[in-house]
């Protein structure tokens, strides 16, 4: 049994420690198979996915807490809107003009597919942001997940149209310069994304972009 299944059973018959009926605990959950990223929480003090955390593999008693870096909604539910705001800030999408037939689109070669696929596995769970010492209100750091998505879309043959804008966004306030390279993110990521590699690559590209902008005047 995983943690989220145990919580669902508790929610079906919620009781206080004294055995009195009470309201069910509030938490986010959807896919139950580590795809949607919604059930991220602190389990025994560690940011992880409740759906892939097995009860038998955890130290007992199990302590569950909400993620601490995000506004608390209620119980274990938090507001992770900041991630999506950051993704909008760096234009983390592929622009598509639907007013005419786009055809089959550009060819993506196997080498590109192999390089990009790991980054496409991000489930927006925000575990990387939770464990990052630089992700806080003071720095406004966009976080590893956002930086990794910049690399993904800048490597996409259609997404490249916004490449310079994305790099400029990463060079601004709360951008890549706030990363202290603690590498907590890559340890916490449930999908084993190459986050530190993405950060290093984007740091290089940001510097190159700043030099280009300087020379252009």
Where are the regions that the model predicts?
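Ferredoxin-type iron-sulfur electron-transfer modules in oxidoreductases and energy-metabolism complexes
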Residues: 2-23, 64-217
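A short, basic-hydrophobic beta/loop patch
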Residues: 60-62
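Charged interaction scaffolds used for protein-protein
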Residues: 51-53
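Short, compositionally biased
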Residues: 55-57
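Conserved phosphate-handling catalytic cores of large alpha/beta enzymes
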Residues: 39
């Amino acid at each position: 049994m995983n943690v989220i299944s145990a919580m669902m059973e508790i929610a079906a018959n919620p009781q206080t420690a004294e055995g009195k009926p009470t309201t069910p605990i509030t938490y986010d959950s959807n896919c139950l198979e580590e795809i949607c990223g919604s059930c991220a929480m602190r389990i025994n003090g560690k940011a992880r996915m409740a759906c892939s955390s097995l009860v038998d593999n955890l130290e007992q008693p199990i302590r569950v807490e909400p993620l601490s870096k995000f506004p608390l909604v209620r119980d274990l539910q938090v507001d992770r809107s900041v991630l999506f705001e950051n993704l909008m800030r760096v234009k983390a999408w592929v622009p598509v003009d639907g007013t005419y037939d786009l055809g089959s689109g550009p060819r993506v070669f196997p080498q590109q597919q192999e390089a990009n696929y790991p980054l496409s596995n991000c489930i927006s769970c925000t575990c990387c942001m939770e464990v990052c010492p630089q992700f806080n209100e003071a720095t406004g750091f966009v976080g590893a997940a956002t930086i990794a998505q910049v690399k993904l879309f800048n490597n996409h043959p259609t997404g490249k149209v916004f490449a310079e804008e994305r790099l400029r966004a990463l060079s601004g306030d709360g951008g890549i310069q706030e990363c202290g390279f603690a590498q907590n993110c890559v340890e916490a990521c449930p999908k084993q994304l190459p986050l530190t590699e993405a950060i290093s690559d984007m740091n290089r590209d940001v510097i190159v972009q700043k030099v280009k902008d300087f020379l252009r005047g």
